[in-house]
Design a protein with these regions (language model features):
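The feature captures the beta-strand-to-loop junction immediately N-terminal to the Walker
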Residues: 11-13
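Helix-to-loop junction immediately C-terminal to a conserved catalytic motif
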Residues: 26
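ABC ATPase NBD coupling module
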Residues: 41-53, 67
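Q-loop/switch helix immediately C-terminal to the Walker
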Residues: 58, 65-81
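Walker B catalytic motif
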Residues: 103, 132-133
């Protein structure tokens, strides 16, 4: 169980299924047994925008390379006019106005990851799943992204489940850390 506004970290060696677990929690894959519930409702019953959003480790794989980034942002759950929230998130994520006219291949990994995070922070997002989202970035960009993301999730009571190989990072950003190890039997 992940409580509203809680920050949970997940650590495990490579190949232990951390990304698969997040895919199940996001509804991209079905579990072999059991079910994922959001406020008591099975996740597969949600239609349209699902309040569980995933931010992938490789942002270039989560966007359509043929779409301008303004369209990528518009895929998020925003009020019709874009709203104050979207503007605030874009500012917190350091998204420059001129980037919106570009295509994904025209941005760096860090710049593109900022778009992916902003898109995931739609107005109805309740749980954010973060899969090694800053592993490929320099330390300054990592700090900027995590600072903005934690500020936004805290102010809106959004739960965060973060996967990382960095114990130090998870200790700084999470209230609880789950260590996955080999399961026998």
């Amino acid at each position: 169980t992940v409580e509203s506004g809680e920050r949970v970290g997940i650590m495990a060696p490579s190949g232990f299924g951390k990304t698969t677990l997040l895919k199940i929690l996001a509804g991209y894959e079905r579990p072999e047994s059991g079910e994922v519930l959001l406020d008591g409702t099975p996740l597969e019953r949600f239609r349209g925008y699902v309040p569980v959003q995933m931010i992938w480790q490789h942002p270039e794989l989560s966007v359509n390379p043929a779409r301008r980034l303004k369209t990528v942002l518009a895929e998020g759950d925003w009020p019709e006019d874009g709203g104050v929230m979207r503007g605030r998130i874009e500012k917190e994520m350091w998204i420059l106005e001129e980037w919106k006219e570009r295509y994904p291949a025209e941005l760096s990994g860090g710049e593109l990851q900022r778009f992916s995070i902003a898109r995931a922070l739609g107005q109805r997002t309740e749980i954010l799943l973060a899969d090694e989202i800053t592993a490929m970035l320099d330390l300054i960009t990592q700090r900027q992204i995590w600072s903005a993301l934690l500020k936004e999730t805290q102010s809106r009571g959004i739960s965060l489940v973060a996967v990382s190989h960095s114990q130090e990072l998870l200790e700084k950003i999470c209230s609880r850390i789950l260590h996955i190890s080999a399961i026998s039997g």
